[in-house]
Amino acid sequence: MEFPFSLIIQWLSDFLLPLVRISSMIMVMAGIGAKTVPTRIKMGLAVVTTFLVVPVLPPVTFNNLFSFEMILVVIQQLLIGVAIGFASLLMLNTFVLAGQILAMQTGLGFASIVDPSNGMSVPAVGQFYLILATLLFFVFNGHLMMIQMVVHSFAVLPIDGNWWAVDHYWDIVTWGGWMFTTALVLSLAPLTAMLVINMSFGVMTRAAPQLNIFSIGFPFTLVAGLVIIWATLGNFVTQFEFQWLKMVELMCTLVGCSP
């Protein structure tokens, strides 16, 4: 049985172009996109996911594989997939940054471990928050929601060679500012508590100059930091849920869905 060349090209377009968007999202998304996950597993998951969702996707109208326009279409699919996965990565990095800010202010920053995702030495508090956020990401079915978002994006942003509006690119740029602002807000309550403790040490120094504040203050600050982290863990799920909704809102601005 022979297949026409045009039919083979159509089959390749229907599979390869969605594969580019889905695989780029999986390579970047939180949890699965980490460097600790082997690339073969990521690509295998991308191929299986693409194979399952291709039958329900709109037909690809752009099937000219051997042209310069095809290169632009592939770049477009890469950008869309990376942008969708980048939103989930920013959400997790928000908690990492909040943990690092808290570690620096409480004196716990000296406790560092090597982050296997990037090979750098980072505060243990930030990694602790990252582990909690990653577990909650899968508890909230974040991996399934990411696949749902990228599949929905094919209906709103079909593979036709048309690019995003300029506002969408600016939205992606502003996500970085949102991450730093949110991390500061998450660590604001512990930072306020540490500020009160440091002010009390200042009052003690003025009241009793002979008191060696360095031998007392540093151990007390460490213990207070651990107590503050323990006290704020009860609100961690609530904060994650709020950031989760914000992440969904960010992705919906790209794929045109309702949060």
Where are the predicted features?
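Hydrophobic alpha-helical segments and their helix-loop boundaries in membrane
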Residues: 1-259
